[in-house]
Amino acid sequence: QARYSYNTRRWAVASHLEHFDTGFQMDTAFLNRVGDTNAWAYGEVNFYPDKAKWPWLRRIQPFTFNQATHDLIQRGDEFFTIEAVRLFFTRQGFVRLDRLTGHEPFAGQRFKTNRWRVQSNAQLFRWLSVYANASAGLATFYDPVSPYQGRSNDVSSGFTFQPSGRLSESVDFQRVAFDRESSGERV
């Protein structure tokens, strides 16, 4: 493994390179992928709007994340890039908008992974936090015998109610819809 990172208040960049042989095993850690060589690069820039003009907006952070992997077990190459922007607000408010494009190997085939995603959360009150996420686009149906390209639409939302240090209740909702891309058939 090799890693490099550099950051200031305005900029951050990082890169990473690693290789795990097919026979690699580590019993004391969770490792879900071996037999690959992986490299990624990340870059961000931070903008701090004028608090007098935009008192509710704390920071704007465009960023990119790019990853390339040669996978010996799945017999192919994976590549994806994420182009995104994060918005940081008062009350621990946060919104992330991104577009993921790329492809991945599975069972000797190549599948597209193009998706739009939105993530958000906020601490509305000391005792109430909320979140909502959505994702839509191409996805893979991971059947080891007969995988295929699909389209997935995912939404999730929820809240945590914590009126005291002794009581915390979270309620979450998640819906995932997956359709076969070739026919539109719901899976």
Regions found by a protein language model. Name each.
Residues 1-187:
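Exposed, low-structure sequence patches enriched in small/polar residues
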